[in-house]
């Protein structure tokens, strides 16, 4: 990806280091919003934005190095602050009947297995930006589908 963007190692490190700050920043914004907007609504919007951004990245990844990729790439970790916090809160609510420890363990296991499967897929192609965009889109769509299905089956609408 660094070569596709045409970044020096230093510029790449600073850019993605700055991106990493977007996750706690968006999480702080989420903490304020969740008092007024239901967590499920915030999660759905974050996943929709994540999927839309990934979809926009696909043609940009196909056309070669582009500075236009950078702001779109920044939106992915920004949405992670909303997705992680709200998905975890809603999941804990759904599984609290089996016990907090068991539920937390199951969630952690699932996250690590998913990361182990998804990470190689993102870099499987020679065009890393394309692989990342396709994988991000697929993950956002699957997650959104899960939120819709679980939300429909839940008696609790939050």
Which residue stretches match the model-derived regions?
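Small-residue hotspots at the loop-to-helix junctions and early N-terminal turns
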Residues: 9-17, 105
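Residue-level signature of mid-helix packing/kink "hotspots" within the transmembrane helices
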Residues: 20-28, 116
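Short amphipathic helix-loop junctions that connect adjacent transmembrane helices
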Residues: 1-11
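Multi-pass alpha-helical transporter architecture, strongest
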Residues: 137-158
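C-terminal transmembrane helical hairpin of 12-TM major facilitator-type secondary transporters
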Residues: 41-87
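Helix-to-loop junctions at the C-terminal end of transmembrane segments
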Residues: 26-41, 126
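Transmembrane alpha-helical segments of major facilitator superfamily
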Residues: 15-23, 111
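A late C-terminal transmembrane helix in Major Facilitator Superfamily
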Residues: 87-128, 135-136
